[in-house]
Amino acid sequence: MSNQIKFVGLHAHSVFSVFDGLGYPQDHIDYAVENGMDALALTDHGNMNGLAYQVLHSKKLQKEGKDFKPIYGIEGYFIDSVAKWKEEKAEIDKNKKGRKKKELNSAVVI
């Protein structure tokens, strides 16, 4: 039995986590394999848009004889109330529109 401690990443964001992730799922998987991991969890923010990439690339590696196990995941969020969340989101959207309108009506002096 080996004394080597195995590591598996259980929290990774790809390009499908806007503003927070880098690389496509297959890039993450290749990096994991190159660094001795035999599994990796892809946990993008609120979506599983990278799932097909993850599945196809994992199957490709398995056909090549690599023992890699994809872990399918998602980073989810808990909210107290859908109604309250909708109100807060509407207020944020309203403020964004008002701010954009102000910016468009502002004169720029150089």
Predicted regions and their residues:
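Phosphodiester-processing cores and adjacent nucleic acid-binding clamps
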Residues: 1-110
